[in-house]
Amino acid sequence: MTMTDPIADMLTRLRNANSAYHDTVGMPHSKIKSHIAEILQQEGFITGWKVEDAEVGKNLVLELKFGPNRERSIAGIKRISKPGLRVYAKSTNLPKVLGGLGVAIISTSHGLLTDKQAGKKGVGGEVLAYVW
């Protein structure tokens, strides 16, 4: 059976692995998931990511980041725009996550950007997720 929302599946796997203190989490690979992983690494939520060959297709493996006493670097993840209800934001009305402490991942005409990057470029788009 096909997956309806692969981005929500990625975020759920990441949330579950983070709450269970796993060091890595694997999932089926796609380009958009790789771009989301790149943003999470740039913002310091994960230590790294890699694409591995699997028996069928490829797997994306994320290395989770924890503090010195195993504090989680990801406090929360929320999927915003869903297949049943798309959420868009104009460049003048981009969301702020926790007053700027978190990150909104936005799909724009310039690719996937954070809310801060989209504001600097002056573009809006589909608000995929919040991470804080």
Curated annotation (Swiss-Prot):
Any single Gene Ontology cellular-component annotation: ribonucleoprotein complex
Example of a GO biological process term: translation
Protein origin, superkingdom: Bacteria
Family designation: Belongs to the universal ribosomal protein uS8 family.
Self-association and partners: Part of the 30S ribosomal subunit. Contacts proteins S5 and S12.
Protein's job: One of the primary rRNA binding proteins, it binds directly to 16S rRNA central domain where it helps coordinate assembly of the platform of the 30S subunit.
Name assigned to this protein: Small ribosomal subunit protein uS8
Organism: Streptomyces avermitilis (strain ATCC 31267 / DSM 46492 / JCM 5070 / NBRC 14893 / NCIMB 12804 / NRRL 8165 / MA-4680)
Gene this chain is encoded by: rpsH
